[in-house]
Amino acid sequence: MRIEKLQQAYDIEPVLVHFPLHPETPAEGRDMTTFYAERGIDPEAAYARMKGLMDKEGLPYSRRSHTYNSRLAQELGKWADTQPGGYTIHDAFYRAYFVGAQNIGDTEVMIDVVKSVGLDTEAARDVLKERRFKDAVDAS
C-alpha cells in the first residue's frame, strides 16, 4: 500500500482524517443499485473503476450489495488511535467493509473488528455507547 511504502522511505507518521461521506445512510444501509440510480451512475462502470484502482495498489476489493453508515466506525477508529497498536483497526475496517461487505455501522460487527485487532471490547462498547469520540470526528 502507498502509505506503507512512504513510511518505509520517509520518517512520517500518517494522520487519518475521518469524515462522514453519506451521513444520511440509515443503520440498515442502502442498496447500491438504488444508490447509484439516484446519482445517475452506472454501477458496473463504478465497480470496474474502483476495482482497477484497488488492483493497481494491491488492495483487495469485492463487490458489495449495500453501502453502510460508517460514522460510528470512524468514532471507534479515533478511539483506537489512542490505544497501543490501535492503528491496525483501520485496515480491519477496510477489509470488513470493502472485502467482506459487512455493515460496519452495526455494533456487533464493530466489536468483532475490535476483537480481531486485540483491543478491549468492553472499552469499545463504552466508547460507542457514550459517543466519546463524536467531537473528534466532527473536528476532522
Show the residue positions of the predicted features.
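Thioredoxin-like thiol-disulfide oxidoreductase module
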Residues: 53, 126-140
